[in-house]
From Swiss-Prot:
One of its GO terms (molecular function) is small ribosomal subunit rRNA binding. This is Small ribosomal subunit protein bS6. It comes from Pelotomaculum thermopropionicum (strain DSM 13744 / JCM 10971 / SI). One of its GO terms (cellular component) is ribonucleoprotein complex. Keywords: Ribonucleoprotein, Ribosomal protein, RNA-binding, rRNA-binding.
């Protein structure tokens, strides 16, 4: 397994419950595909460097995981089709 850092930005107009629901969705996806969650950081609402999908702010979440490369590809696919996610990035950390 490799170590990854997953960063994603949720729309700022979502309610706290919906944020938690989306985070839980990705948490379940990681665990169901054999990944291990090391740490979840909720950075909260922050200003974006530039406008993304007509939003100036976003709710940042950082998740550190141990996972196989297939899971990283699956996460990328699901992030792309999830409307609540403005941007995402999956980075493999050096061992």
């Amino acid at each position: 397994m490799r170590k990854y850092e997953v960063i994603f930005i949720l729309r700022p107009d979502l309610e706290e419950e919906k944020n938690a629901e989306v985070i839980e969705k990705f948490k379940n996806l990681i665990e169901s595909h054999g990944g291990e969650i090391i740490k979840i950081d909720k950075w909260g609402k922050r200003r974006l460097a530039y406008e993304v999908k007509d939003f100036r702010e976003g709710f940042y979440i950082v998740i550190q995981i141990n996972a196989e490369p297939k899971l990283a590809a699956e996460l990328d696919r699901v992030f792309k089709i999830t409307d609540e996610v403005l941007r995402h990035m999956i980075v493999r950390e050096n061992e």
